[in-house]
Regions:
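Helix-biased "structured C-terminal domain" signature
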Residues: 1-400
């Protein structure tokens, strides 16, 4: 059986591993699939009675979506508790004075109240040498309901900058780490694009991928997605210099409550990045078609941002209103081993002035692993798509 890009084993072996994990944890699994060819699969984990089910959602063709949903459910089950288990309290001053975090927008907001202690997790760089104390709240979206005793920081003014980007599950740490870093780069580039086009208005056009340049497998996926969504799909090249390719996919005429829904994907392999974006686009529309909570969340986002013109424009993300220039998809690069792939990702980030730190936060003898990647220089403005009242972490007003 074929092993998918950025994966270490077949889907069958990957499924067996995660199902063994859930079985040993006495967790019951319920799967629901939405879609015929390309689809969204929702997995619900049911634990002991009286606890709320935990969900995960997968994308792609049926088997891929099903396995992806299981791993995302594992991520949602263990990620935040695992991070908290690895956290400690540190003097606030020593954390924010680290060179890598100096001037970071959410932390400068917190500093105004002069807290004494803050919860942080220690990460190491790609060489396993230099360490970074990473404030827990920046990644743990549920921390505000589980604040560690002794943490004296008032997070109320900065919690809107919290993002769980950078946590990923996989078969083995290397696979999980690749996906964790990819997610951070994806959010970073998406945030920059939204800031330049809709917040500051310094970028007047987007780069649209000429879909005739897609290789056969990506072209088939593209056509399947257009059939599944009954609409024409556009693909935007959102890549930033020196970083791996990032693409956004959106429907030309399928907004939800006036908000354009888009999928995003990042990979060293441009065709795989496009595939991830297209699959996520289908996933989101299938969820919108089948779950009223999706529309309810969009209504909340609108309510939060309607009075903030630039933020509301960034939420709506009307890419079709912008001019465009056609670009070709780059030729596929040579296949790398997973270890080479991970090394290349971290090296590119470092070369771009955006170093990443990694940590395995959970693992199991079955072979499953949870990785957390953090990038202090990540642009967090993509959080506007969740209805958060945020501003770009840096100014793009002078960039054309």
């Amino acid at each position: 059986m074929t092993i998918l890009p950025e994966r270490s084993v077949t889907l069958t072996r990957s499924r067996n591993a995660i199902e063994r994990y859930f079985s040993r944890q006495n967790i019951q699994i319920k799967n629901d699939n939405f879609g015929n060819t390309l689809s969204a699969t929702v997995t619900l984990l049911n634990r002991e009675s009286g606890t709320k089910p935990i969900s995960g959602c997968g994308k792609g063709y049926a088997e891929e979506a099903s396995v992806g949903a299981l791993y995302e459910a594992y991520e949602h089950y263990r990620s935040f508790p695992a991070l908290r288990e690895k956290s400690r309290l540190y003097p606030f001053g020593s954390v924010i004075q680290q060179a890598e975090l100096r001037g970071m927008l959410p932390l400068t907001i917190l500093a105004k109240s002069s807290p004494a202690k803050i919860a942080a997790v220690e990460f190491t760089d790609k060489k396993g040498c230099a360490s970074l104390l990473w404030p827990l709240f920046l990644t743990d979206c549920e921390y505000f309901s589980h604040i560690i005793q002794g943490d004296t920081t008032d997070y109320s003014a900065a919690r809107r900058y919290t993002s769980n980007a950078g946590i990923a599950a996989g078969y083995g740490f290397t696979e999980a780490a690749i996906h964790a870093i990819g997610e951070i780069i994806e959010r970073h580039c998406t945030g920059i694009l939204l800031a330049k086009t809709f917040f500051y208005g310094t970028q007047k056009e987007v780069r649209l991928v000429n879909t005739d340049s897609l290789p056969p497998a990506a072209e088939k996926l593209f056509n399947d997605a257009q059939s599944a969504l009954e609409d024409e799909i556009n693909i935007i090249d959102a890549s930033e210099p020196s970083l791996p390719p990032v693409y956004l996919a959106y429907c030309k005429s399928k907004p939800r409550l006036g908000i354009n829904i888009y999928g995003a994907g990042c990979s060293l392999y441009a065709d795989h990045a496009v595939a991830r974006a297209i699959k996520e686009l289908v996933q989101l529309h299938k969820l919108a078609d089948n779950f009223t909570c999706f529309t309810e969340e969009l209504e909340k986002h609108q309510h939060n941002l309607r009075e903030h013109e630039k933020l509301y424009r960034s939420l709506v993300a009307d890419f079709g209103s912008l001019a465009s220039v056609s670009v070709e998809l780059p030729e596929k690069r040579a296949e790398l081993t997973l270890q080479e792939h991970l090394h290349r990702l971290t090296t590119l980030c470092e070369m771009a002035g955006l170093p990443v730190w990694l940590k395995e936060i959970d693992s199991d003898p079955a072979g499953v692993s949870l990785a957390c990647a953090v990038m202090p220089g990540m642009e967090r403005f993509a959080l506007v798509s969740l209805g958060n009242v945020v501003i770009p972490c840096r100014s793009y007003q002078d960039q054309i």
